[in-house]
Structure formats: C-alpha cells, structure tokens
C-alpha cells in the first residue's frame, strides 16, 4: 500500500515521502497515529501545499534573522557589574543580562539564541556569538566593566 508521510518517521522517511508499506502497518499504525495518509491524488497535493507553506515560513524567518544580524554585527555593548578587590564579579554576566541590554537598544533577541558556554565572571571584553537561525549568526562584543568606575 502506498502512503505519503505527514511527519518524519525514523527508518521510513521524511514529510512528503511516498513509501510502500504493508497494508496492516499503514492501517493499524501509520494512519491512526497521524504519521501518514493514503497516497491519493488529493492527499499528495495537500501535503505538497503544507511543505510549500513551511518553506515560505522558513524563508521569512531566515530573512528576519538576516535583518537582525545586520543590526547586531559589530555592535559593542557595555555591562557594569559590582567587582571585588581581585577583579572578579559579584555574581556573573549571563545570557539574560546580554538579552536585556540588547532589548534596551531596541533589538529583541531570545536569550537561548545567545551562545555563552559559561557565565562571564571576570572583567574584560568578550566576543559573543548570537545564532539567530541555523544558517545566520552574528558576533557582538560585550565589555564587562566595574560598576564603581
């Protein structure tokens, strides 16, 4: 029986693939679970339309990410924190702090898109990568300075 996949099914294929499976597997598992539809002309057109919509959405998201990346590229921000006598920060600079400063500058970035392995705990300048889209990223410079200067 030929079916068209509506979701990615490990070992069988991805969305939009037309595969040939045993009738029982299709009727008892793939179709009831929403993984596939019988490969009729109308179902094929329906799934192809869904794929086109997803492609357009991904293209819009990429264009928006590229626009934000242009604003971010080369941007330098300063974050002031309380510092002890050894030059270590009381607390640390996290992705939330960076996202907040960017928001104040009018650039909305989700904190999970800021690639910071570990919180910053020392004074200095750091290059931080922001991954806006799987294919689009930008680098900003973050200057961490003492609050009392």
Curated annotation (Swiss-Prot):
It comes from the Bacteria. Belongs to the bacterial ribosomal protein bL9 family. GO terms for biological process: translation. Binds to the 23S rRNA. One of its GO terms (molecular function) is structural constituent of ribosome. GO terms for cellular component: ribonucleoprotein complex; ribosome. The gene is rplI. InterPro entries: Ribosomal_bL9 (IPR000244), Ribosomal_bL9/RNase_H1_N (IPR009027), Ribosomal_bL9_bac/chp (IPR020594), Ribosomal_bL9_C (IPR020069), Ribosomal_bL9_C_sf (IPR036791), Ribosomal_bL9_N (IPR020070), Ribosomal_bL9_N_sf (IPR036935). This is Large ribosomal subunit protein bL9. Pfam families: Ribosomal_L9_C (PF03948), Ribosomal_L9_N (PF01281). Keywords: Ribonucleoprotein, Ribosomal protein, RNA-binding, rRNA-binding.
């Amino acid at each position: 029986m030929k079916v068209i996949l509506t979701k990615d099914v490990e070992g069988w294929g991805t969305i939009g693939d037309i595969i040939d499976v045993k009738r029982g597997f299709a009727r008892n598992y793939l179709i009831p679970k929403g993984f596939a539809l019988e490969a009729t002309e109308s179902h094929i057109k329906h799934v192809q339309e869904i794929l086109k919509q997803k492609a357009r959405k991904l293209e819009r998201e990429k264009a928006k990410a590229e626009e934000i990346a242009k604003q971010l590229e080369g941007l330098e921000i300063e974050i002031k924190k309380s510092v002890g006598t050894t030059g270590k920060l009381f607390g640390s600079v996290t992705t939330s702090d960076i996202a907040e400063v960017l928001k104040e500058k009018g650039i909305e970035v989700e904190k999970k898109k800021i690639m910071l392995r570990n919180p910053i705990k020392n004074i200095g300048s750091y290059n931080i990568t922001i991954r806006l889209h799987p294919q689009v990223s930008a680098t900003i410079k973050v200057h961490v300075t003492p609050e009392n200067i």
